[in-house]
Amino acid sequence: MRPPACWWLLAPPALLALLTCSLAFGLASEDTKKEVKQSQDLEKSGISRKNDIDLKGIVFVIQSQSNSFHAKRAEQLKKSILKQAADLTQELPSVLLLHQLAKQEGAWTILPLLPHFSVTYSRNSSWIFFCEEETRIQIPKLLETLRRYDPSKEWFLGKALHDEEATIIHHYAFSENPTVFKYPDFAAGWALSIPLVNKLTKRLKSESLKSDFTIDLKHEIALYIWDKGGGPPLTPVPEFCTNDVDFYCATTFHSFLPLCRKPVKKKDIFVAVKTCKKFHGDRIPIVKQTWESQASLIEYYSDYTENSIPTVDLGIPNTDRGHCGKTFAILERFLNRSQDKTAWLVIVDDDTLISISRLQHLLSCYDSGEPVFLGERYGYGLGTGGYSYITGGGGMVFSREAVRRLLASKCRCYSNDAPDDMVLGMCFSGLGIPVTHSPLFHQARPVDYPKDYLSHQVPISFHKHWNIDPVKVYFTWLAPSDEDKARQETQKGFREEL
């Protein structure tokens, strides 16, 4: 759910009490060439030798997750880093898995962990280097790159992204010129010098993190570090890459959908579309023109029975916001269907655009016997003991076991119009079941994300029809294509790694 501007006026005290493909890298080749030349000039000047560091001076933090698939991928990356270090006959660096560092709900937001990094590593380390589990690192090149930057100074390094236009997911920040503010693409890796970590730690101790929403972490971290000009902006590093392997890249990131086994069968995925009478005429036809035919099991849940669609009236009155009552009725109906034991449930809005075929591939990496709650992760109040949740617009994916455990608990909506995705997040948090994040689900439209960010993704969903042609968006970004088939060879290699 995208939080409304005055959400706190809408939430009752009961809730408040609980709240404590496409564009290649080469399109920017001129800028990249300039950056690489500047890098090479720095190396020729001898600056890199002055800032000599070894691997022991770098602390690697893999932004991992506790789900078994993600934890395994992170462990494989850790082994790769340590093997490369051993091959260089250097003392092995510290390689940390984020999900193992702290039990607190908000560890994935990273800022709450900076004091730990400061206390533990500031004496003997120069850099904290963060990366995703699918980031690939060339350790010798990374060392060469970091040696260009004086580790006694405050540095915030990464591959720079910027908004193409003011966007709702960033609260329309820098609306006069959205391109001016740069933030890191986590997939390429990003780094903080220890002096900057120490400075941020002092700030965190003097002023606690605000208890509000975490929507796009990479943008929010960059804003916090920049501190309205009081801190350093992001320094773009051309060797931090998300394109295919190139001679100058210290990091790379491959664009493919995970495929661990055979794709999950369509009959094992039940799709529930939330709608209401007022949208039967404009939104439902879009679903039928685009992705409905991909779904083997699909039902439309409404406040009004219309046989031509057809819709199912769950007996829950429509609400202008929240839809918690409707969502929990869908969960009950899914679990209690006597004729089948479908492994997966997907709940989407009637203005969600989704690729079922790509979802089939992705779900091959997850065990429906585990409690899996998957989608795009947001957070609420994570600086003060809040919770994470899967935002509903991009689609919420549940394993049958997750639904079973949820409904076996006493956690329910406090009202029919409560925000369903946030209530689900609270419930799963209370059950000790972490949400699983996939950046391939999107709460907003393609135009709301940087082109360079989407260029290394195989997206599964987008959301909202506002000011776009949703049919064109679907066939441009999500429809099954020959390009999807061409990725099979890459995916075979991925399966072999697993």
UniProtKB/Swiss-Prot annotation:
GO terms for biological process: brain development; camera-type eye development; cilium assembly; cranial skeletal system development; fucose metabolic process; gene expression; limb development; protein O-linked fucosylation. It is a single-pass type II membrane protein. One of its GO terms (cellular component) is endoplasmic reticulum membrane. It holds the Pfam family Fringe. The keyword Nucleotide-binding does not apply. Pathway: Protein modification; protein glycosylation. Residues 28-498 are lumenal. One of its GO terms (molecular function) is acetylglucosaminyltransferase activity. The chain crosses the membrane at residues 7-27. Its EC number is 2.4.1.-. Keywords: Carbohydrate metabolism, Congenital disorder of glycosylation, Dwarfism, Endoplasmic reticulum, Fucose metabolism, Glycoprotein, Glycosyltransferase, Membrane, Signal-anchor, Transferase, Transmembrane, Transmembrane helix. Widely expressed, with highest levels in testis and uterus. A motif (Prevents secretion from ER) lies at residues 495-498. It is an enzyme of class 2 (transferase). The keyword Membrane applies. It is found in: Endoplasmic reticulum membrane. O-glucosyltransferase that transfers glucose toward fucose with a beta-1,3 linkage. Specifically glucosylates O-linked fucosylglycan on TSP type-1 domains of proteins, thereby contributing to elongation of O-fucosylglycan. It is linked to Peters-plus syndrome: An autosomal recessive disorder characterized by anterior eye-chamber abnormalities, disproportionate short stature, developmental delay, characteristic craniofacial features, cleft lip and/or palate. This is Beta-1,3-glucosyltransferase. It comes from Homo sapiens. The gene is B3GLCT.
